[in-house]
A protein has these predicted regions:
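Polybasic, low-complexity RNA-engagement segments
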Residues: 15-171
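Conserved beta strand-loop-helix elements of the APE1-like EEP
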Residues: 7-15
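A short catalytic or substrate-binding loop motif that flags glycine-/basic-rich loops and adjacent residues
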Residues: 1-4
Length: 171
């Protein structure tokens, strides 16, 4: 047998036209705590509710936004379905929503609420990328760090100090 010879088998399925049968994905329900924390977080953080046209679902302890018309992925290994929004941190008595890095990167300009805009040549940008805290006046809470208008990651402002939430593996 020569390298490259062999057989290929594929099962095709009709996706449009008459008599189409597509299974929809089954989503895991979102806990009441998670939904409450997500809504509180998004109201406090964004100027416009992101992913409002998508369905919320849980994969383990993580909250995802998935398009409603996603076909079933049963039998396929999907690295990630939808956008990871975040997870709950803290105790069961006092849970808090912790946003994911992928959420920051998926946000559109019109959805961004509180933000810290940095220029590409700003020394604060280098400090942020290295994991240091930044000084910035403003309202306490989560904010998106942006460079030239594009989201880079999260920070959490408390008493005019922005705590760095840039993922350690990317620093």
């Amino acid at each position: 047998q020569v390298l490259g010879e062999g057989h290929f088998v594929a099962k095709l399925q009709k996706t449009s036209g008459e008599n189409v049968m597509m299974k929809s994905a089954i989503f895991n329900p979102v806990s009441k705590d998670m939904e409450k924390q997500w809504l509180e977080f998004s109201r406090a953080t964004f100027s416009k509710q992101p992913f409002s046209d998508m369905q919320l679902t849980m994969f383990g302890e993580k909250l995802f936004a998935v398009p409603e018309n996603v076909p079933t992925l049963r039998g396929l290994k999907a690295l990630r379905t939808g956008v990871w929004l975040g997870s709950l941190q803290g105790s069961k008595q006092k849970p808090r929503f912790e946003p994911s890095h992928s959420l920051a990167l998926a946000l559109r300009q019109e959805e961004l609420g509180e933000r810290l805009e940095l220029s590409p040549n700003d020394e604060k940008l280098q400090r942020y990328m290295q994991g240091h805290e930044l000084e910035s006046e403003g309202q306490d809470g989560w904010l998106v760090i942006t460079v030239a208008g594009f989201p880079l990651g999260w920070g959490r402002r408390s008493k005019n100090i922005v705590k760095n939430a840039y993922p350690k593996g990317l620093r």
